[in-house]
């Protein structure tokens, strides 16, 4: 690395892609074992291996960027393109769920009673918990933007305050969603309405948990002075992801909760 004549980071050999692939194999096999034989042993081994791989791989990335200085502007540009493509892939992922919902709701079959919501389904009131959830996520979008601007201006105190507020709102959203699921008058097995509702909102909830975890890591990194006003792609990626989660929820709220009810 001493005599490098280019701006790109030549990554050292790493075991983490191999252990990541192994953990994916164990998790998918473990799911099958759980579904068919009611044994969670293989699934737990897979999840543990996956968590350890993620922790150690991202630990290496933080060391290479923050402490060894390998993330030059050219490398950061590549990471930005990578994050943008990842978010686009997530948009297409959710497009499939919206497609399933609109396919079923715009032309309900005779089996559904020829109406939407299907006969016997009592949808949730969009002006109760779903509206509160919308307010919570919109507020978190404001606070993450406040945190980003504070970071760019070198205002460490306000950045930490705003980031903490965002994380708190993310956790609050998750708790509200869990209580809504617990009290819902229908289940995932209640036909196409139940399956599209719980799969779409459930995967969004999973993304909120992932985004909250991402932001918690950024919070602790900021406490350790890892970010500067012009070198903070880890936080920027988390902010982009959080805005994506916000926008997806708005589409979910308008489509499934409001129009779909």
UniProtKB/Swiss-Prot annotation:
InterPro entries: Cyt_c/ubiquinol_Oxase_su3, Cyt_c_oxase_su3_dom, Cyt_c_oxidase-like_su3, Cyt_c_oxidase_su3-like_sf, Cyt_c_oxidase_su3_a-hlx
Coiled-coil intervals, chain numbering: none
A GO biological-process term: mitochondrial electron transport, cytochrome c to oxygen
Locations listed in the record: Mitochondrion inner membrane
Top-level division of the source organism's lineage: Eukaryota
CDD domains, sorted: Cyt_c_Oxidase_III (cd01665)
Transmembrane segments: 16-34, 41-66, 73-105, 129-152, 156-183, 191-223, 233-256
Known EC number: 7.1.1.9
UniProt similarity note: Belongs to the cytochrome c oxidase subunit 3 family.
SUBUNIT field: Component of the cytochrome c oxidase (complex IV, CIV), a multisubunit enzyme composed of 14 subunits. The complex is composed of a catalytic core of 3 subunits MT-CO1, MT-CO2 and MT-CO3, encoded in the mitochondrial DNA, and 11 supernumerary subunits COX4I1 (or COX4I2), COX5A, COX5B, COX6A2 (or COX6A1), COX6B1 (or COX6B2), COX6C, COX7A1 (or COX7A2), COX7B, COX7C, COX8B and NDUFA4, which are encoded in the nuclear genome.
Protein name as annotated: Cytochrome c oxidase subunit 3
Native source organism of the sequence: Bos taurus
